[in-house]
Swiss-Prot record:
Pathway: Lipid metabolism; oxylipin biosynthesis. It comes from Oryza sativa subsp. japonica. Residues 161-863 form the Lipoxygenase domain. Pfam families: Lipoxygenase, PLAT. Binds 1 Fe cation per subunit. Iron is tightly bound. It is found in: Cytoplasm. This is Linoleate 9S-lipoxygenase 1.
Length: 863
């Protein structure tokens, strides 16, 4: 600091370059670290403890293998004058470099060394008044650990974008070194908190063989193919060397250090919250259930969860948990005081009308505008056929006949309804039939494989026609189906039989939603892209800059899921009907996963909901015009596609440049052959030899990470927080006329219905979880936003991104206007709950949509 003052007084500043570093508060970022407050007094602590060295992009050091010349060390320090105002939780430090432009050239990278005893989070370093360059920005967004933790220098490049062939020669070795460090091929693990290694592994850490609770290894075999997850390098279990040992709940599972949220993200809150549920609230719920009859008896009993709450018994574990968790994170999390009142906010589905969920209209509307609107397909043949192998399952053709449905076809015959695109099906029959014998052998589980036929009315709403409930029936070597068809009824016991039939459908749909639409098709399939991008694409690569925001926190939330949610005996197995067979079932589904069908237009065409239409902006035409998920989603898809197309065209003027991009080709090869290696021989993989292939792939990746995940995640509590609307488990069969159970249904239909679906314990546990998982954080970064305005120096890219953001804001207005249109009946429905899950929320720059809002498309899968 005194040296800087001397230079000012003597005028010796000709070779000085001023810089400004932005650091994040440790106290804000890591509430568990009680030394963090000491670090936040940056003026007292830092002094000479953080040093910086500029690296030339234009002048090579021939004594250092032609690498860019490295300048002398400069210290971060508090400035003499008042610094510009900073955002909450940020600290700004100045730095002054001795750098002769005519001798050292243009700075293109910066080396940071942390000589302090603990880590800090560096956001950016900006050089001001650089001769010939004006401003140079180094974007870090990285945890910097003490220098002894690394066997290499931490280096950050200026925010320019370079294809590998365009990288300044003096910086090329640094670029290659950095990728080699991230690949960590020479490091087997177990990896530590400070490590930055991205490697692959199979899902071999879900079970605990040493405690007689094994689960099959998913990935790496024909029997159980699966996407890869991030490697932790933990030691194998004693009983099964192919399974990885697990950590205790409170231990932090490894993810590369910069994948751990450097912000008070909702995924951080989720980590504490889920552990609070498992360690504190879950035992309290068990005790409560043991001390009471253990069941809800009426819908009114369930509604008490949202009115007065439940008084849980005093559990010592809750007090111990309260002491161990950061105060900021538990204010609204753990029940407080001697009464331990557990109360939930009222879900949107029952806010305006507590019984609308029971109607056929709302049941059908949610198939188009609910939690799982990506399963319905157009029926093209009648009766519906099965795709199951007839040599194993016999003839599984539906038993629904024209007599079951023609009275509700508004004067049409079945063939006429088919020909006019008026028949649709929610078909879970083939999804679950192969697994029902195992599933129904679990304690407390009895469910069906369901088919639901629907008719498209003139006003574009759907009308349920029939529900087929099927069970496996073993005949010799065949597992055929034993089925019964139920049709709508509006009064008497028949209406409650119909209500139960819809509940069995909802159970199927809930399981498929959580297991496939949500976990497999967003969380699991995205992780290989995250790993491959960090291993093969430099941070200076334009495709890295395009995709990186859509990976934020994904590895972290997936690691948390493996630790507490999808593991053997975890919350998922306890609350969703496939139980311990759930993940193995998702592996069977993954066998038929196809990356090229994950984009919305291709998905809609595959399901017969849309046809190709070159004249349409989205190139498809919907056959159900009022299909909120698809209507909004196509607008989002088109905006993403236009943005990606404009962006990629800046860097790839022709296919030859793309084909010669060694990093891009290595990235795509690794995605296919390693990350999704169990499907590497599929013929649908794009060859990545043309610009359209790249733009389609990147558009699909961004779609999955943002809009698709938002559609299946942030409506969980609003739609399913009231379990009768979306039960996750069924526990007994449909009662047969003349049976004791049929009499029970007739005498007390509410009680029978509630005792058939998810139990009291499972309900409270499940609702506790999805309340957490449905929340947005105050610092959520939505589609069309970036966490760092200086993410690139390229003005063409910045202008294209502004156009993208403006287009998303325009979509917001269109969504709100459609929700006000009384002719679009599927937008709001009988429950008076508008569909906003595909509302981008790009216009929200202040975190106004914090909490459970049922709107907003975050950039990434972070919860």
């Amino acid at each position: 600091m005194l040296g800087g003052l001397k230079d000012k007084l003597t005028g010796k500043n000709g070779n000085k370059i001023k810089g400004l570093a932005v650091l994040m508060s440790r106290k804000l970022l890591d509430p568990r670290d009680f030394t963090a407050s000491l670090l936040d007094n940056v003026h007292e602590v830092f002094g000479n403890s953080i040093t910086c060295q500029l690296v030339s992009a234009t002048v090579a050091d021939q004594n250092n293998e032609g690498r860019g010349i490295v300048g002398s060390e400069a210290n971060l320090e508090q400035g003499l004058t008042d610094l510009p105002s900073v955002s909450q939780g940020e600290s700004k430090l100045t730095v002054r470099f001795n750098w002769e432009m005519d001798k050292h050239g243009v700075p293109g990278a910066i080396i940071i060394k942390n000589h302090h005893s603990t880590k800090f989070f560096l956001k950016t370093i900006t050089l001001h008044d650089v001769p010939g360059c004006d401003t140079i920005v180094f974007v870090a967004n990285s945890w910097i650990y003490p220098v002894g933790k690394y066997h290499y220098n931490r280096i950050f490049f200026a925010n320019n974008s370079y294809l590998p062939s365009q990288m300044p020669e003096a910086l090329r070795p640094y670029r290659e070194d950095e990728l080699r460090y991230l690949r960590g091929e020479d490091r087997q693990g177990p990896y530590q908190e400070h490590d930055r290694i991205y490697r692959y592994d199979v899902y071999n850490d879900l079970g605990e063989p040493d405690r007689d609770n094994p689960r099959p290894v998913l990935g790496g075999s024909q029997k159980h193919p699966y996407p890869r997850r991030g490697r932790t390098g933990r030691i194998p279990t004693k009983k099964d060397p192919n399974s990885e040992s697990r950590l205790s709940l409170l231990e932090q599972i490894y993810v590369p250090s910069d994948e751990r949220f450097a912000h008070l993200k909702m995924s951080d809150f989720a980590g504490y919250s889920i552990k609070a549920i498992v360690q504190g609230i879950l035992p309290a719920i068990r005790t409560y259930v043991d001390l009471t009859p253990g069941e809800f008896d009426s819908f009114e009993d369930i509604l008490k969860l949202y009115r007065g709450g439940l008084k849980l018994p005093s559990i010592p574990a809750l007090e111990e948990l309260r002491k161990s968790f950061p105060v900021q994170l538990i204010k609204d999390l753990l029940p407080v005081g001697g009464s331990y009142l557990l109360k939930f906010p009222k879900p949107d589905i029952i806010k305006e009308n507590e019984v609308a969920w029971r109607t056929d209209e709302e049941f059908a509307r949610e198939i188009l505008a609910g939690l799982n609107p990506m399963v319905i397909r157009r029926l093209t043949e009648f009766p519906p056929k099965s795709t199951l192998d007839p040599s194993k399952y016999g003839d599984q053709t539906s038993t629904i006949t024209p007599a079951h449905i023609e009275k509700n076809l508004e004067g049409l015959s079945v063939q006429q309804a088919l020909d006019s695109n008026r028949l649709y099906i929610l078909d879970h029959h083939d999804h679950f039939m192969p697994f029902l014998i195992d599933i129904n052998s679990l304690d407390g589980i009895f469910t069906y494989a369901t088919r639901t036929l629907l008719f498209l009315r003139d006003d574009d709403t759907l009308k349920p026609l029939a529900i087929e409930l099927s069970l496996p029936h073993i005949e010799g070597n065949l597992t055929s189906a034993k089925s019964k068809v139920h049709t709508p009824a509006s009064s008497g016991i028949e209406s409650w039989v119909w209500q139960l039939a819809k509940a069995y459908v909802a159970v199927n749909d809930s399981g498929w939603h959580q297991l496939i639409s949500h976990w497999l098709n967003t969380h699991a399939v995205m992780e290989p892209f995250v790993i491959a991008t960090n291993r093969q694409l430099s941070v200076t690569h334009p495709v890295y800059k395009l995709l990186q925001p859509h990976y934020r926190d994904t590895m972290t939330i997936n690691a948390l899921a493996r630790q507490t949610l999808i593991n053997g005996g975890g919350i998922f197995e306890q609350t969703v009907f496939p139980g311990k067979h759930a993940l193995a079932m998702s592996s069977a589904v993954y066998k038929n996963w196809n990356f090229t069908e994950q984009g919305l237009p291709d998905d809609l065409i595959k399901r017969g909901i849309a046809i190709k239409d070159p004249s349409s902006p989205s190139k498809v035409k919907l056959l159900i015009k009022d299909y909120p998920y698809a209507t909004d989603g196509l607008a989002i898809w088109q905006a993403i596609e236009q943005w990606v197309t404009e962006y990629c065209a800046i860097y790839y003027p022709n296919d030859g440049v793309l084909q010669g991009d060694v990093e891009l080709q290595a990235w795509w090869k690794e995605v296919r052959e390693v990350g999704h290696g169990d499907l590497k021989d599929a013929d649908w993989w794009p060859k990545m030899q043309s610009l359209p292939e790249l733009t389609k792939a990147c558009t699909t990746i961004i779609w999955i990470a943002s809009a698709l995940h938002a559609a299946v995640n942030f409506g969980q509590y609003p739609y399913a927080g009231y379990l009768p609307n979306r039960p996750t488990i069924s526990r007994r069969p449909m009662p047969e006329p003349g049976s004791k159970e049929y009499t029970e249904l007739d005498e007390n239909p509410e009680k029978f219905f509630i005792r058939t679906i998810t139990s009291q314990f499972q309900t409270i546990l499940g609702v506790s979880l999805i309340e957490i998982l449905s929340k947005h954080s105050a610092d959520e970064i939505y589609l069309g936003q970036r966490d760092t305005p200086e993410w690139t120096s390229d003005p063409k890219a910045l202008e294209a991104f502004k156009r993208f953001s403006r287009q998303l804001v325009e979509i917001e207005s269109k969504v709100l206007n459609m929700n006000k249109d009384p002719l679009l009946k599927n937008r709001v429905g009988p429950a008076n709950f508008p569909y906003t899950l595909m509302f981008p929320n790009t216009s929200d720059n202040k975190g106004a949509a914090e909490g459970i809002t049922a709107r907003g498309i975050p950039n990434s899968i972070s919860i």
